């Protein structure tokens, strides 16, 4: 066996190493000479790229209807690959949302973990932005090219993507908002096999439902525990909301006065005044949870706490302990916006390629996709509060701002 070179070979004959390093190097060399297989085993067992990524398995999944890639044309191969990529993106989104859901499941939620939740939401945004770009690849498929193999897809549909349904469930989409596909009573029915038996997609969705409440549920629980101006009592929440709505009315009066100063005609001023008055009344009903007469007292109390927390965090975001909560809320809003844009872009791609014909799964096609983009919102309170926020000078003063500063423990 060739002798292993000493340290001087690598450092130069005239180089000097510190004595501890020289001793350590000699111990390592003696160990390798005594047990040469110890270092070699790592080399022979190192993973390679194609095994780690499972390249061959991935490249064997584009066989189409007959599981024979030789019978698949370039256009159909593109169609298959892009949809497979979407499913992989959905898998990553589900991982990030699940991690965030599990974080907010905790009570209390550790403040130092909020940054990781914000990163998860930002990653989901980036994935959706990347997925939107993939529609450009799909649009290289002409109408006639797609029609050559489209009929063979019937009754398959993108609606049957179990992972997309999982994302909706994990976020917390209300079943009452769901738009019927066109031929079944429940979205779960579309996931069954042709003979009505449960499929792998059905089992996946059922497992997601069994995994527990949604991200929105736990987010609302977290928000409802937020101290409002130092208090978590219902009376303190209502007191803050009434103070805030008074400030809103004062701000609207200021805007009316601006209209008068700019010489708007009296009828225009009155129309503007009536509009602002209606806005103020609607805002007060929303914040005090009086916008749903059918809700019971406990539900209204919870909604007041959640909505007060959103307004409070947004209005006083400069306070140190509110900075990360505000970042989380902003990232969630950005995430839902990205998903809505993805839905809208999906609809425009479909319209460009096949127009407004009936979908392969029996849906209204583009009309169905457009409706999902308009109606499928999970975090409605976050969107509504954007209409209610005030300029910084108009935000009411709070008494316990010091409660939201950084905490520095006294030295012993």
UniProtKB/Swiss-Prot annotation:
Gene3D superfamilies: 1.10.287.3810, 1.20.58.480
GO biological process: L-tryptophan catabolic process to acetyl-CoA; L-tryptophan catabolic process to kynurenine
Highest rank taxon of the organism: Bacteria
TM region positions: none
InterPro entries: Trp/Indoleamine_2_3_dOase-like, Trp_2_3_dOase
Organism: Sorangium cellulosum (strain So ce56) (Polyangium cellulosum (strain So ce56))
Protein name stated in the entry: Tryptophan 2,3-dioxygenase
Primary enzyme class: oxidoreductase
Keyword Iron part of the UniProt annotation: yes
Cofactor list: heme
Record family assignment: Belongs to the tryptophan 2,3-dioxygenase family.
Cofactor note: Binds 1 heme group per subunit.
Reactions catalysed: L-tryptophan + O2 = N-formyl-L-kynurenine
Presence of the UniProt keyword Oxidoreductase in the record: yes
Keywords assigned by UniProt, alphabetized: Dioxygenase, Heme, Iron, Metal-binding, Oxidoreductase, Tryptophan catabolism
Pfam families: Trp_dioxygenase
Record-listed heme binding positions: 346
Described function: Heme-dependent dioxygenase that catalyzes the oxidative cleavage of the L-tryptophan (L-Trp) pyrrole ring and converts L-tryptophan to N-formyl-L-kynurenine. Catalyzes the oxidative cleavage of the indole moiety.
Residues given in the record as substrate binding sites: 79-83, 146, 150, 360
EC number: 1.13.11.11
Alphabetized PANTHER family for the sequence: TRYPTOPHAN 2,3-DIOXYGENASE (PTHR10138:SF0)
Molecular function in Gene Ontology: heme binding; metal ion binding; tryptophan 2,3-dioxygenase activity
